[in-house]
């Protein structure tokens, strides 16, 4: 008869200690909080208060969530981080840091923090290539690995004329591999209510326009499995602080868009402290988990003690 393997007390306690340490580290990297239920196509699952020091720093401005729950973040301070989103059922309960590091230039050298390191949007192409859009020096870099060199790819034509702090903040990959990009505060001279936007790929961009709500600016976009786009829009005033809204395009808006088309969305979520927290909401991601579609939102703390890095998680029920 085969004997069951015996585990020594020392090995058992070591394994238990490692598990406890991992759990404590996950809890230290993010503290969960509950969200109220809301009507509409998004079912709130919960939120996390992130600990940026466990992720290499704050200032998160772009996010990607993979089906295996790997959360990838970029910062407008020029670094990236990976962590595992921990769920109890579908409720977020913690974040397990995996690795982090600086974004690098084409020679593999860390991009100096400051003007050149203002990374604002993150997307992943079907072949696994990461695309990172930068403001101030408006450009897009492509990375096979985020810890490797990042080569320039052709940005949308005319983007160099965008205001220093108003370039690409929204970058998303459609199911057919095309990119959807929106500039934050880059407007046509005769239509200040619009923002320059594009569909296509490096070297093959089709110019469009995005129309945000009055007073709002687009900060990120993600694509639902049915091809509709979610666009995150933010507003700030000295008296009112931050507020945001998440909007959704019509079913055929991206598929049928032609050069010069004006795209807009319908509001599906408000983030203005009633009842969801009002913060500097910067990034949105969509992924599939089994038969569920998950939507994640990330706020940018600007590395300020007056702001927070938050993650909100929703299940799509639209």
Feature annotation, model-predicted:
Residues 2-7, 12-318:
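Sequence/structural signature of beta-propeller domains
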